Amino acid sequence: MQFDYIIIGAGSAGNVLATRLTEDPNTTVLLLEAGGPDYRFDFRTQMPAALAYPLQGKRYNWAYETEPEPYMNHRRMECGRGKGLGGSSLINGMCYIRGNAMDLDNWAKEPGLEHWSYLDCLPYYRKAETRDIGPNDYHGGDGPVSVTTPKPGNNPLFEAMVTAGVQAGYPRTDDLNGYQQEGFGPMDRTVTPQGRRASTARGYLDQARGRPNLTIRTHALTDHIIFAGKRAVGVEWLEGESTIPSKATANKEVLLCAGAIASPQILQRSGVGNPELLRQFDIPVVHDLPGVGENLQDHLEMYLQYECKEPVSLYPALQWWNQPKIGAEWLFGGTGIGASNQFEAGGFIRSRAEFAWPNIQYHFLPVAINYNGSNAVKEHGFQCHVGSMRSPSRGHVRLKSRDPHAHPAILFNYMSHEQDWQEFRDAIRITREIMNQPALDKYRGREISPGTECQSDAELDEFVRNHAETAFHPCGTCKMGYDEMAVVDGEGRVHGLEGVRVVDASIMPQIITGNLNATTIMIGEKMADAIRGRQPLPRSTAAYYVAGGAPVRR
C-alpha cells in the first residue's frame, strides 16, 4: 500500500490533518487508529453528561497509570487517554478553553517559533469553530467544531459561583476565550446543537469519511515508523488480533499524532530518542534525540466539596430511577441535563502578583462527585475543581518494552517544586474565601472536603498528596523548539530526520493555561497549512487583555 501521507492517531489533531489534507483530491492519506469507531449509539461517549463513563473502562480509554509519584505519597495515578476515532476528544470533559493569549506569546519568544504568537494562532482557532451564538473577532461561525455557550436560566449554582468570585474581588468575564480570560464567567463546551459530544471524529472526519482519497484503519496499533537512513518511508502496524504486521509506504510524510504519551513511545520504538534507553531494548538507533519523551507536563487539580442546603444540585440525576427520563429527553430532544457536560462556569485568577497571567483555574460543578464518577456524595452538594496551570515540575515517558501493546513508564513528578506547594495552598485558601461569599449563603452547607479541620500548611499539603488528581492534560514530550532538548522545529518536523512530523499536544513547549483540546485542534489546523505548503492565514488584529501591573483583585 502506498499513500502520500500516513497519519498515526485519529485524535484531536490527526483528524484535523486527515480532513484538511484530503481536501486536495490528488492527495492520498492513510489514517491509522489503535482504537475502534466512535459508535454513535453509545451514550457513554455521545451524551455530554455521561462524560465519566468512558474513563471507567478500556474500550475508549488507554487507562495508563503512572509510576509511583514520589511527591504524592508514592501513589500510582490515573493517566487516561482516548482510544478510538476522536482520540481524547471522544472521552474528555468537553470544556472548550483555549488557554491564555500570553501562553502563545510566551512560546513565540523562542527563536524560530515567532509565528506561534496568539495573533498568529487566533485565526486557526476561529477556522476550527462554529459557536452557537455566532462569530466575532475571537470566535468562528463555520468551522467543524461545534461550540455551545451556556445560556441564562441554567442551574442557579453556576451564576452564584461566578458572582461569589466577583464578590471576592476578582473580575467577571463574559468570554473565557475572548478579550479577557482572567476572571469568572460561563465556560464554553464542545457540544453540538443537538446535544451530542462534538469530538473531532464528528466535526472533522464526518466531512472526510466518504472521500476516495482517505483510507481509515481502526484497531490498527502502530508498531514503528520505517526509516531508510534518516528518512521516514512508511509505517508498520498490527491490525486487530493479528500478530502479522501490516505495512504501508508514505511517499511524502509520516505524521505522528498519537498524543503526549504514545507519540514519544512510537518514536522510541522506531529508533529515535535517547540511545541509552533504546539500547536497553536492542532497538537500532536511527537518530540520537535526547528530548523524546522528556518535558512531560500536566495539570493537577483538587475538589473542594460542599453540602448544598437547597435541593438544586444534580444529586437526583445520580439516582437510577431518574435516569430513564433524563436519557429520553437527551436521546429524542437533545435537551435537558444530559445535553450538558455540567461544567458551565469557571474562571482563571492570579494567586499572587508575581504571575503575569492567571496561574489558577476553576471549574464549578453542581454535584459532589469524582471526575470519573466514583465516590459520589450521598446528598445535595456542589464542588469546585481548582488547580495550578504552569507547574515547573517535569516528568517523562519512556519505553518499558519493544512490545507495542505494553504501556510505557510514565512519571509526571507532580509537586516536585516549592512553587507547586505554594500555589496549591493559596488555591485552597482562596477557594474557601470565594465559597464564603454572600452569593452562596443560601446554598452553602458544611465543607465536606477537605473539611474545616484542614487548615495548616502541613494539613493542606497532606490533603494534596492524598487527594489531588490529574486533569488529564499531558503534553510537552516532543517539544517544539531549537534547544538541545527540542524534538521538532516550528513546523513540527523532527530534528535531524526527513519525512516525519509530530502534530499533537506533545509539541507544546510549555503547558497552556487551561484545557488542551481546543489548542491541540488549532495546532492541527495551523500545521495542515504548513504541510500543504499554503500561506498562513493573515494575523488577527484583535485586542487582548494583558494584566501588566494590575492588582490580582479589587
Curated annotation (Swiss-Prot):
NCBIfam families: betA, PRK02106.1. This is Oxygen-dependent choline dehydrogenase. Belongs to the GMC oxidoreductase family. FAD binds at residues 4-33. InterPro entries: BetA, FAD/NAD-bd_sf, GMC_OxRdtase, GMC_OxRdtase_N, GMC_OxRtase_C. GO terms for biological process: glycine betaine biosynthetic process from choline. Keywords: FAD, Flavoprotein, NAD, Oxidoreductase. The active site is at H473 (proton acceptor). Its EC number is 1.1.99.1, 1.2.1.8. Its cofactor is FAD. GO terms for cellular component: membrane. It catalyses: choline + A = betaine aldehyde + AH2; betaine aldehyde + NAD(+) + H2O = glycine betaine + NADH + 2 H(+). GO terms for molecular function: betaine-aldehyde dehydrogenase (NAD+) activity; choline dehydrogenase activity; flavin adenine dinucleotide binding. Involved in the biosynthesis of the osmoprotectant glycine betaine. Catalyzes the oxidation of choline to betaine aldehyde and betaine aldehyde to glycine betaine at the same rate. The keyword Oxidoreductase applies. The keyword Flavoprotein applies. Disulfide bonds: none annotated. Pathway: Amine and polyamine biosynthesis; betaine biosynthesis via choline pathway; betaine aldehyde from choline (cytochrome c reductase route): step 1/1.
